[in-house]
Design a protein with these regions (language model features):
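Hydrophobic alpha-helical connector segments
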Residues: 55, 66-100
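Hydrophobic/aromatic-rich alpha-helical bundle segments in the mid-to-C-terminal region
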Residues: 101-102, 113-201
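Secondary-structure edge/capping motif, primarily at the C-terminal ends of alpha-helices
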Residues: 71-75, 108, 158-162
Length: 201
């Protein structure tokens, strides 16, 4: 197994154990045992559990979110179509990291001592600035903030639903786009214009 594949395998197993047992109750020793490797082999890639979690966020959430932000900043001034595409791309980003986003919400207390929470907050606030107008009314600012929250929260608030994850992601995206469309026009929520699935350039 190559170094890159070993690192990814460690991340995958760690995330599974964190979800199953909780972050605080999972040790590096248990992760190594689950992988069938020595602690020394694990330490080669990650010296601490915090390093491991940080790598997960950097690879699966922070990096992709930065790519969305970079795309948005390159497409200024922000039109409604650009705002909707920002949501489209960010929805795909979250969809590709569903287990990690769920972990983030379920382990907020444990993550508070790490820099991850603050880094994620920074990205979300940056995205919020990109999808709302500077002179937006307070109600429209709330709509834009609610759009981002909707995409995050739907992943775990509808766990009892029979819909598959992709259907829930698309439904949350549709609602988020309706909210941002309403905020852009300064009116009550209405259907968002048609947009394709996430298009990466």
């Amino acid at each position: 197994m190559s170094r890159g594949n070993t690192r990814q395998r460690i991340q995958d197993v760690a995330l599974e154990l964190f979800a199953e047992r909780g972050y605080e109750k999972t040790s590096l020793r248990e992760i190594a045992e689950q992988l069938g490797v020595t602690k020394a082999a694990l330490y080669y890639h990650f010296k601490t559990k915090e390093d491991l979690v940080t790598s997960l966020f950097e690879d699966l959430v922070l990096g992709p979110a930065d790519a969305v932000i970079a795309w948005a900043e390159a497409h200024q001034p922000t039109t409604l179509e650009t705002k909707l595409e920002i949501l489209n791309r960010y929805s795909a980003c979250i969809g590709n990291a569903t287990p990690l986003v769920r972990f983030m919400h379920e382990n907020q207390a444990a993550l508070r001592d790490l820099s991850i929470g603050e880094q994620m907050k920074t990205r979300i606030l940056t995205l919020l600035q990109l999808i709302k107008d500077q002179d937006a009314a307070l109600t429209d600012q709330v709509r834009c903030a609610s759009a981002l929250f909707t995409m995050h929260s739907t992943l775990f608030t509808l766990e009892g639903s029979n819909a598959d994850p992709e259907e829930k992601r698309k439904a949350a995206l549709e609602v988020a786009q309706e909210l941002v469309t309403a905020a852009h026009h300064g009116s009550a929520p209405g259907p968002a214009p048609e947009t394709g699935n996430a298009r990466h350039e």
